[in-house]
Regions:
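Glycine- and acidic-residue-biased ligand/ion/polar-headgroup-sensing regions
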Residues: 413, 426-435, 446-450
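Conserved catalytic-core segment of clan PA serine endopeptidases
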Residues: 38-50, 111-171, 195
């Protein structure tokens, strides 16, 4: 691979370069590089499949080997591949799970794909963000109006309090004869192609069809945030203008999972070369942000009811506890996620709108959400960011939804929808049991981890040719549970869903 500083930017590339800052370490200014795919030995498709988890690059796959153009083999590190569905489709932000996201501060935080991010085929809205150290750190934590169903997200960061030796043990990998800390990154920066030492401008930034990924190694000591291409590797995807906010990950050998290294922020240079810098993920800052947007509720088998304004609750008739703040300077109400533990009942005696707040039900307990009485059209409704049903938990949902306000379900637990909801279900994980006639107007399965089980012979909306059932972004499983079902067409994206009889 050639020294990156020898490639000169053409006028189009220079225009894109303004989107990614360059930190100069010397007076001699090197050229900032674009998202450059080295195609002397590898096909463009390999980089795209890697970044989109297609073909052999499935999440969790280990020991992946691909063929170079000359017929020789290139073996990826012996690490389970990350799930790159965390990337927003334009690449400038990433999901951290539930209703949280991550980007850099210098991106436009009030417009574009940061204010209205898209994951899969769902468009979300940013309702808040938090800067770190008075905005001196080039990182921003995001709060969305709904739980993201297209990805489980990566919500934990690496530990930057470790020494370099400790980090090498915890996050290091033996690769090509050397112990290294490898960093995996996915983004949608502007695309250049390099072949025969010539660079060709190809495509502008933020094209969802050209999401690509690369493998890098830590540069310098742990904690610097710096990383670079692996010397001598043929599979090279240089960071580009337009890659600001793209997520970078490291593998935690202790926890056997991927954690966030940071968000890609800068090109850094000296007289001889350029490399990359991520703003390090701050676990304490993220927890502070979550604390602002969540409320722990020890239900412990009790019965909870909400007050008339839906800004406070009481358990078993005891004193009210406030959980929603006043509107702030952005005019957004502090709509907290309610995190329930211990099992129990939520009693709803009026239509309840939680805004951007969701309901999180902790593991291995039974919960019931009841409509206490009925209005003229049926049970009272509940709307908000969605439901997160924890592992082993079961939620009996005996209320209705609100037309135009979709239900987003995540978590590995089970939700029994026992009433007609009048809206759409978007499920990314866990099991949804549809026990009412036409339980939802439309069902959208994403991420490949969710199961929709039919508990009623007419649970789906049978208007049209496709039963208003969509498999998208890795799809999911439809368990017909012994019921008869006929399709004229099945709506699916690239990855097919599974129909279980």
């Amino acid at each position: 691979m050639k020294n990156k500083s020898q490639y000169q930017l053409n006028p189009l590339t220079k225009a894109f370069a303004a989107a990614l800052p360059v930190v100069m370490m010397a007076t001699c200014v090197p050229s900032a590089q674009a998202n450059t795919l080295f195609i002397q030995n590898h096909w463009v498709r390999d980089y795209l499949d890697f970044g989109q988890n297609k073909g052999v690059f499935k999440p969790g796959a280990v020991g992946v080997t691909i063929q170079r153009k000359d017929g020789t083999s290139f073996k990826l590190p012996d690490l389970p591949l990350p799930d790159f569905s965390v990337a927003e489709v334009h690449g400038a932000a990433a999901s951290l799970g539930n209703g949280y996201g991550l980007t850099v501060r210098h991106n436009n935080l009030t417009g574009g794909s940061i204010a209205r991010p898209q994951y899969g085929h769902s468009i979300y809205q940013k309702v808040d963000h938090m800067l770190v150290n008075g905005g001196k750190e080039d990182i921003a934590y995001l709060r969305y109006n709904k739980f993201v169903v297209e990805s489980t997200g990566y919500g934990e960061g690496a530990n930057f309090n470790l020494s370099h030796e400790q980090a090498l043990d915890r996050y290091g990998t033996d690769y090509q004869g050397k112990r290294r800390i490898l960093i995996y990154r996915v983004g949608n920066g502007s695309v250049n192609l390099v072949k025969d030492d010539k660079k060709h401008g190809f495509l502008g930034a933020y094209n969802r069809d050209f999401q690509s990924a690369g493998i890098y190694e830590l540069r310098g000591n742990w904690g610097s945030g710096d990383f670079d291409d692996i010397v001598g590797s043929s599979f090279v995807n240089e960071v580009t203008s337009g890659d600001s906010g793209s997520i970078s990950l490291v593998y935690d050998n202790y926890q056997k999972k991927w954690v966030v290294f940071g968000t890609t922020a800068f090109l850094v240079g000296n007289n001889y070369n350029t490399w990359y810098r991520a703003t390090k993920f701050d676990n304490a800052a993220m927890q502070q942000f979550k604390d602002k947007w969540s409320k722990n509720v020890a239900l412990n088998g009790g019965t909870l009811s909400f007050n008339e304004k839906a800004d406070a609750y009481q358990i078993n008739g005891n004193a009210e506890v406030a959980f929603r703040g006043d509107k702030d300077q952005t005019k957004n109400t502090n709509d907290k996620d309610l995190i329930f533990t211990g099992g129990g009942t939520l009693r709803v005696n009026r239509d309840l709108d939680l805004g951007s707040g969701g309901l999180i039900f902790a593991d291995d307990k039974k919960y019931t959400v009841d409509s206490y009485g009925f209005d003229q059209e049926g049970p009272f409704s509940v709307s908000g960011a969605g439901i997160n049903a924890g592992a082993g938990s079961v939620v009996d949902w005996n209320v209705s939804g609100v037309k135009g306000k979709n239900m987003h379900q995540i978590g590995t637990g089970t939700v029994n929808y026992n009433r007609k909801q009048n809206n759409q279900l978007r499920i990314g994980n866990g099991t949804a049991v549809l026990n009412a006639e036409r339980t939802f107007d439309l069902v959208y399965l994403a991420n490949g981890l969710g199961t929709v089980k039919l508990g009623h012979e007419k649970a789906l909306n049978e208007d049209g040719n496709m039963n208003n059932l969509i498999f998208t972004e890795r799809g999911g499983t439809l368990d017909v549970n012994g019921h008869s079902l006929s399709f004229k067409r099945i709506a699916t994206n690239i990855h097919l869903g599974i129909i279980k009889l």
